[in-house]
Amino acid sequence: MGLILRWKEKKQLSSKQNAQKSRKPANTSFRQQRLKAWQPILSPQSVLPLLILMACVFAPIGIGLVVSTISVQRLVVNYTECDALAPAKHFETIPSEYVDYHFSKKVAVQPQWMVLTDPELGNQTCRIQFEVPNHIKKSTYVYYRLTNFNQNYREYVQSLDLDQLKGKALIGNDLDPNCDPLRTVENKTIFPCGLIANSMFNDTFGTTLTGVNDTADYLLTTKGIAWDTDSHRYGKTEYNASDIVPPPNWAKLFPNGYTDDNIPDLQNWEQFKIWMRTAALPNFYKLAMKNETNGLGKGIYIADIELNYPVRSFYGTKSFVLTTNSIIGAGNEALGIVYLIVAGIATLFAILFLIKVIFKPRPMHDHSYLNFENSDTPFDESSVVSIPLREIL
């Protein structure tokens, strides 16, 4: 009798262990995939309203974007070859492939350029003379545009130290290793470290558009060009000048290194903040200056650009961009065109479906024909088999 009881206990124990080891999902609607779901049956009648609604929404938005883009007035001068093509003693018309402009009125004088060379320092300045044919009442912005510069590489994007930018005096191995190979030089800390800071755009734009003849000068400012959301990322540094050195590519800006008087204040250096916000695409614009208080008067102006940034090393270009803005920022023709294309495609398919429904309807696709509960007609299996598969689908 005892043997029988022990055998039953072992059998019950083994059955419990098997139940515990079972990989069968729980008997619930979610685990057994019995949740209720809506599977819409798409037909021309149901899709037509959606296409018409899509066209009605996208078309006005696209038209508005295109109109706002057309209202943007701009001048774009690619000055990459200014040092090679521009004369040194007089102005010369800029070749058409380096210029693009759009104003409300026709330009009478084509943009011109010349290059000036400092005999002592050897610095070169590209001087651009251009005409504004009409008074611009809107705010005016100056951007620089770079092409073929990939700021979106992972190694490049991560090459900074956030704590150092906030002002902490980090040294040696305390710096983020992503700053390598630009963390230290001869036991001195590079401030700011990393590839992003080292490659900062350093062509210098004059803050005054000098008027020619009776045209008044137009003043621009670098204040307020950075995003307010970036202000918390930067602070006044705690470094001593003797402990740090500038990045290698800043040698021209700080020829004798740092002193107690010239350590950059990243908290208030807005051009630096603009550059540190990396671009997603290889061709991008970055704001350099602006004037949001006074309009730009009609006349001829001169803009001076000190040439420092070597774009030829990465087969890129650099451009001077003078522009107004629209409700979506600078002119963006592609966005409005994309909206219009989507609206056009929706309209085209809506028309095709409407023609299909009117001239060649398919009554068997009416949902009322799918109810066979009250049907008195006997089911004919042979008729179903004879229907081609493409007709059933």
From Swiss-Prot:
PANTHER family the UniProt entry points to: CDC50, ISOFORM A (PTHR10926:SF0), CELL CYCLE CONTROL PROTEIN 50 (PTHR10926)
Lineage top rank: taxon: Eukaryota
Location(s), subcellular: Golgi apparatus, trans-Golgi network membrane
Cytoplasmic side: 1-46, 356-393
Mode of membrane association: Multi-pass membrane protein
GO biological process assignments: phospholipid translocation
Glycosylation sites: N78, N123, N187, N202, N213, N240, N291
Keywords: Disulfide bond, Glycoprotein, Golgi apparatus, Membrane, Transmembrane, Transmembrane helix
Lineage: Eukaryota, Fungi, Dikarya, Ascomycota, Saccharomycotina
Miscellaneous information on this protein: Present with 4510 molecules/cell in log phase SD medium.
Name assigned to this protein: Phospholipid-transporting ATPase accessory subunit CRF1
GO cellular component terms attached to this protein's record: endoplasmic reticulum; Golgi apparatus; phospholipid-translocating ATPase complex; plasma membrane; trans-Golgi network
Source organism of the structure: Saccharomyces cerevisiae (strain ATCC 204508 / S288c)
Stated role: Accessory component of a P4-ATPase flippase complex which catalyzes the hydrolysis of ATP coupled to the transport of phosphatidylcholine and small amounts of phosphatidylethanolamine from the lumen to the cytosolic leaflet of the trans-Golgi network and ensures the maintenance of asymmetric distribution of phospholipids. May be involved in transport from early endosomes to the trans-Golgi network (TGN).
Membrane-crossing segments per the record: 47-67, 335-355
Region of interest (Confers specificity for binding DNF3), residue spans: 70-332
Pfam families tied to this protein: CDC50 (PF03381)
Subunit (UniProt): Component of a flippase complex consisting of DNF3 and YNR048W/CRF1. Interacts with DNF3; the interaction is direct and required for proper expression and endoplasmic reticulum (ER) export of either partner.
